[in-house]
């Protein structure tokens, strides 16, 4: 059994006991989170969401992804710019699919 949820502007296919990485959610590690924007579960297709359906998970970790280096160079001058970015993420383990 699987479900398709919408979170952080993305759609994810999730199953029970699966670990997913989503954008940072303001909760502490060990807390429970419930996703209510369910697009598909048990053969039911939502219009746009399935009513009375939810996916529950436990937050395992809050962290930062690997650094992405952004480099900009203008070849006709000596202008160079180098930046780094580390995206914040939340690691969630799916515990229950209801619906």
UniProtKB/Swiss-Prot annotation:
GO terms for biological process: translation. GO terms for cellular component: cytoplasm; ribonucleoprotein complex; ribosome. The keyword Ribosomal protein applies. GO terms for molecular function: rRNA binding; structural constituent of ribosome. The keyword RNA-binding applies. Keywords: Ribonucleoprotein, Ribosomal protein, RNA-binding, rRNA-binding. It comes from the Bacteria. Pfam families: Ribosomal_L21p (PF00829). Part of the 50S ribosomal subunit. Contacts protein L20. HAMAP family: Ribosomal_bL21. Belongs to the bacterial ribosomal protein bL21 family. This protein binds to 23S rRNA in the presence of protein L20. This is Large ribosomal subunit protein bL21. It comes from Mesomycoplasma hyopneumoniae (strain 232).
């Amino acid at each position: 059994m699987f479900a398709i949820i919408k979170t952080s502007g993305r759609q994810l296919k999730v199953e029970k006991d699966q670990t997913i990485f989503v954008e940072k959610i303001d909760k502490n590690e060990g807390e429970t989170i419930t996703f209510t924007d369910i697009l598909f579960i048990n053969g039911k297709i939502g219009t746009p969401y399935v009513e009375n359906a939810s996916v529950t998970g436990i937050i395992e970790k809050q962290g930062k992804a690997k650094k992405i280096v952004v480099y900009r160079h203008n070849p006709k001058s000596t202008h160079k710019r180098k930046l780094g970015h580390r995206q914040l993420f939340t690691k969630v383990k799916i515990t229950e699919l209801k619906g």
